[in-house]
A protein has these predicted regions:
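Bacterial N-terminal signal peptides that target proteins for export
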Residues: 1-8
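Short, charged/polar micro-motifs that form catalytic or ligand-binding hotspots
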Residues: 11
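C-terminal motif of bacterial Sec signal peptides marking the signal peptidase cleavage site
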Residues: 17-20
């Protein structure tokens, strides 16, 4: 694998001190035109969650602490939307080529425990563990305008523009919601649904669940094709983030230190893209054709590794505490 050196860069900007690392440093004549944002959860209960920002030249900047458990983030137009789980709030920042506006706008979710989100036509649909629902936040009025009851501990959420699919991680169901009527249909997919991806017309689900005494972790995957459900239980194993994503003509799931292709019966191939300690892989996303791995040991190891489709490691970035979700912003001419 190719590996690149990473060094520290400290930048003071206005009243904030941003500390990061980079693989390259841009010249003063080049203008940055993109950002990859990283949600650094921080330590639970410490309110030290932050956002790392990686520019197109590989420079990394980190914001000040913004709350307790920075769970997920999305880009919509020139806005960065952030869900802060244990602070029960939404943060919204304006994005420019120079970064994000601080301190941003803050909206309380009234103790709901927000988790994951999708944005459709100016509305943020986000899951909530404590209230067991999907709330609808309007990006024009800045109001939460609806709440859709779903199953226990809703986690991952995806949309095709007309429907939502929600993984109810505290049980064995996925909720399918019509965006217009907000009506819900539940599909039984097996224990512990976590993350979802739509591939062609099918919805794939990664699952992670536990023994009654929480000492054994089990993994699996499911597929929803209309009303037909395929379920495959993989058995027990090490901790697994359970990412699932579409790549070319196939669907991949995080497994055994990388990403493994799933066959028609949802079995996982032994060959993987990426080769890391499985217990350190917290999240994986595909950005501009490459795979971005959030790597953490919940202590001093907090990195993002970027890997191409051949499994070659392209970049390593040092980021904030306990990195998870990613979001891409690109300047539109």
């Amino acid at each position: 694998m190719k590996k690149y050196m990473c060094f520290s860069l400290t930048i003071i900007f206005l009243s904030l001190i941003w500390v990061g690392c980079s693989n390259t440093v841009s010249s003063g004549e080049d203008e940055n035109t993109s950002w990859v944002f990283v949600a650094n959860e921080g330590n639970y209960g410490a309110s030290d969650g932050s956002i790392s920002m990686i520019d197109e030249f590989g420079n990394v900047y980190e914001t000040e602490s913004i709350g307790d458990v920075v769970q997920s983030l999305e880009v919509y137009n020139n806005k960065l939307i952030v869900l802060v789980n244990n602070s029960h709030k939404i943060k919204i920042y304006a994005i420019t080529t120079e970064g994000i506006s601080m301190p941003g706008i803050e909206i309380s979710t009234e103790g709901s425990g927000p988790r994951e989100m999708v944005v459709v036509d100016g509305k943020v649909y986000f899951t909530n563990w404590i209230t067991s629902d999907v709330k609808v936040f309007n990006l024009f009025t800045y109001n939460i305008e609806a709440s859709i009851p779903v199953g226990s501990m809703p986690e991952g959420i995806i949309s095709d523009g007309t429907k939502l699919w929600v993984a109810n991680s505290g049980e064995d169901t996925v909720s399918e919601i019509d965006i217009t009527s907000l009506s819900e249909t539940r599909h039984i997919v097996g224990s512990g649904p976590q993350n979802l991806v739509k591939h062609n017309s099918d919805v794939y689900v990664s699952r992670t669940y536990y023994s009654d005494d929480w000492t054994i972790t089990y993994h699996g995957a499911s597929r929803i094709v209309g009303s037909e459900i395929t379920i495959n239980n993989y058995g027990s194993g090490g901790a697994c983030g359970g990412s699932v994503l579409s790549h070319q003509s196939d669907v991949y799931r995080s497994f055994d230190g990388g990403l493994a292709r799933m066959d028609a019966e949802l079995n996982l191939e032994e060959r993987t893209i990426g080769n890391y300690n499985q217990s350190h892989i917290y999240h994986v996303e595909k950005i501009n054709g490459n795979f971005w791995f959030a790597i953490t040991d919940w202590n001093d190891l907090n990195e993002v590794r970027v890997v191409d489709s051949n499994g070659d490691e392209l970049f390593t970035y040092k980021v904030g505490q306990n990195p998870g979700d990613f979001a891409l912003w690109e300047q539109i001419d």
